């Protein structure tokens, strides 16, 4: 079969989550990562090359810490009363299935049509149902009209929203500011935004737009979770910061 756009890199990260789930003291449990790997093989998809897999394994502590941080972000958003969530470029992370969502939560996942089709077919074939009250996949190209497609799918622009942008910014051809302009335009006060960013540019911009921002560096985050990085992890996270922002006006 033709491999959907974005599926190879998503499978590489799924392999890292599958490995963490079987660690002695895992930061999270993702039983669905193996579902995607098996589904890819059964469909004739090519798994990531040995070189790609080795690169992912080399930053395993970083990747696991990143997943844990975004998991905690969504759990905290729900605890603070937010009921509308959006994951931009969701990939093959099955948060809609594996996190303990507050009743009444709606989760929108935006990604390439092929990625979402593969993801939902694999989980349906395995008999899995989302744990979130309402799950809405939004097939869209992030370079063209994604916010309109999100609204067409039922997104409420008047409701405070928790956004997540994970593992995406290096692939945004036009730079991040257009993406964050769109998010800002449709996020009322009380909305939250979690971003994996390189450097402080995103945080600085959000601060000028009425968002209250906190940051933590990748090395500090790995230390918090007891995942001290090796040389590969250190290189991967050298300039990476995790931005947590709340819109105040």
From Swiss-Prot:
Highest taxon listed in the record's lineage: Bacteria
Q: Where is the signal peptide?
A: none
Task: Give GO BP annotations, semicolon-separated.
Answer: methylation
**Residues holding S-adenosyl-L-methionine:** 111, 141-142
Q: What is its EC number?
A: 2.1.1.-
- NCBIfam families registered for this protein in UniProt: mthyl_TIGR00027
Please describe what this protein does: Exhibits S-adenosyl-L-methionine-dependent methyltransferase activity.
Please state what the protein is called.
Answer: Putative S-adenosyl-L-methionine-dependent methyltransferase Mkms_0592
Which organism is this protein's natural source?
Mycobacterium sp. (strain KMS)
Q: Please name the taxonomic classification of the source.
A: Bacteria, Bacillati, Actinomycetota, Actinomycetes, Mycobacteriales
